[in-house]
UniProtKB/Swiss-Prot annotation:
One GO MF term: structural constituent of ribosome
Keywords for this protein: Ribonucleoprotein, Ribosomal protein, RNA-binding, rRNA-binding
Domain of life of the native organism: Bacteria
Gene Ontology process terms (BP): translation
Family the UniProt entry places it in: Belongs to the universal ribosomal protein uL18 family.
Name this polypeptide is given: Large ribosomal subunit protein uL18
Its biological purpose: This is one of the proteins that bind and probably mediate the attachment of the 5S RNA into the large ribosomal subunit, where it forms part of the central protuberance.
Subunit-structure text: Part of the 50S ribosomal subunit; part of the 5S rRNA/L5/L18/L25 subcomplex. Contacts the 5S and 23S rRNAs.
Gene name per UniProt: rplR
GO CC term (a single one): cytosolic large ribosomal subunit
Pfam families associated with the record: Ribosomal_L18p
Keyword Nucleotidyltransferase appears in the UniProt entry: no
Amino acid sequence: MNKNLARLRRARKTRARIASQAKPRLCVFRSGRHIYAQVIDDSQGKVLAQASTVEGELRASMGRGADVAAAATIGQRVAAKALAVGVKEVAFDRSGYRYHGRVRALADAAREGGLSF
């Protein structure tokens, strides 16, 4: 089985479990160059908050968007935006990625920023 297909299969199982929790999910996507995070309310089908290394003001200040430091910055930013909207508790959707490196840095920074999961 293809590595990406296996990741997507794991992600599908995780999302099915998260859907029963009835709280917004913090969804992470990482590419070779960037990292993206969204707080999604699946009951309404809306994105409540988002942050990524592609954003203009962050892109200028960050040299590289694909490292652990950038992931930590994105975690803090998405937590601040979620708190501004009134979301304090989320379910963490790591999208089938291992909880290691950039994914872990983003999660730890989001927790430090005030989100609980």
